[in-house]
Amino acid sequence: MSTLRLLISDSYDPWFNLAVEECIFRQMPATQRVLFLWRNADTVVIGRAQNPWKECNTRRMEEDNVRLARRSSGGGAVFHDLGNTCFTFMAGKPEYDKTISTSIVLNALNALGVSAEASGRNDLVVKTAEGDRKVSGSAYRETKDRGFHHGTLLLNADLSRLANYLNPDKKKLAAKGITSVRSRVTNLTELLPGITHEQVCEAIREAFFAHYGERVEAEIISPDKTPDLPNFAETFARQSSWEWNFGQAPAFSHLLDERFSWGGVELHFDVEKGHITRAQVFTDSLNPAPLEALAGRLQGCLYRADMLQQECEALLVDFPEQEKELPELSAWIAGAVR
C-alpha cells in the first residue's frame, strides 16, 4: 500500500474544503504523506485566533456575498478567489517537516519557470523590479503525532479586492487576538501570463511525486457526493456555523455612538464567544426607558445583526409610542455590527 495520498477538490466552497482537510488530517494513518489541492470562491479566511470584526470589513463582505471561514491553523487573514490555488501537505511525525513541503512548492514553481525563495517562516517571494513580492503565504498546525502545512499561491487573484475586505470599518473596537500583517504581493500571471490553476496543480503534484519517488492516482473530492470520510457531516456543520466562524473570536469590546433627532446614544458592548456579556447604554434622550430596557435584553444576546435587530424591534411591544425611534435605533445597531 502506498504511503502517499493525493486529493483534489472540485468544490469552491471554503467550508466544504476546510471540512475535508480537517477530516483527512484527523483520520490519516501516521505513516501517510498527503497532498490536498483545492481553491475557494470569494472568501476571507481567518486564523484560528483571529477576530473577524477586527480583521475584516464584515459589512462589505455581506453586501458582496463574500464568505467568512475560520481555519484551524494560526496566522492572519487572507482573501481567496478563484485566482488562488490552495495546497495542504500532511504527514505523521517525525516525517512531518514544513521545509520539505516548502521545497516541493519551490520545485514546482521552478519547473514552471518561476524562481522563488522562502522568506521568513510563512512566505514565498519572487524578485521584481520593484523589489521582493509575495506570491504565497502559509500557515501550520501540529498535534502530538502529526502536522500540516497549508497555503495559497496567487495566480490571477483580484488584488484590488484585498483592500475591500481586509481593511475593517473604522469601528471603535478594542479587541484581543492576532492581527494580520499586510505584505506586498503579486500574481504569478505577471511572470507567467496565462498560467492556470490546473497547470500549477500539475506542477505541485509532479514535484510531490518526485520528492517521494512514487506515484498515486488522484482522488477527486466533490460536493455532488458526500465524501466518504467519517464524521464529515458533523465537521462540515461546525465549519460552516456562525458559532465557529464568528463566535470563536477572542473577547472584545465595541463602542457605538450616534446622534439622532431625538437624542444621542452611546452603546458599550463586551463580547465573548460571540455573545454579549455586558451591555451599557448612555443617552440624553428625554425618554431613556426603552434604551435602558434594551441594555437588559441584549445581555446574553448573540452578537449578530439579525439578533440585535430582533431585540430592538421587540421593544415596540412595551414602548409602542416609540414607533419612529426604535426602528431607527434598530437599523443603526444592525448596520454597525455587520
Swiss-Prot record:
Entry keyword set: ATP-binding, Cytoplasm, Ligase, Nucleotide-binding
Catalytic activity: L-lysyl-[lipoyl-carrier protein] + (R)-lipoate + ATP = N(6)-[(R)-lipoyl]-L-lysyl-[lipoyl-carrier protein] + AMP + diphosphate + H(+)
CDD domains: LplA
Annotated positions binding (R)-lipoate: K134
Keyword Nucleotide-binding applies: yes
Location of this chain's protein in the cell: Cytoplasm
GO molecular function annotations of the record: ATP binding; lipoate-protein ligase activity; lipoyltransferase activity
Span of domain BPL/LPL catalytic: 29-216
Other observations noted: In the transfer reaction, the free carboxyl group of lipoic acid is attached via an amide linkage to the epsilon-amino group of a specific lysine residue of lipoyl domains of lipoate-dependent enzymes.
PANTHER family per the UniProt record, alphabetical: LIPOATE-PROTEIN LIGASE, LIPOYLTRANSFERASE 1, MITOCHONDRIAL
Protein name: Lipoate-protein ligase A
Name of the encoding gene: lplA
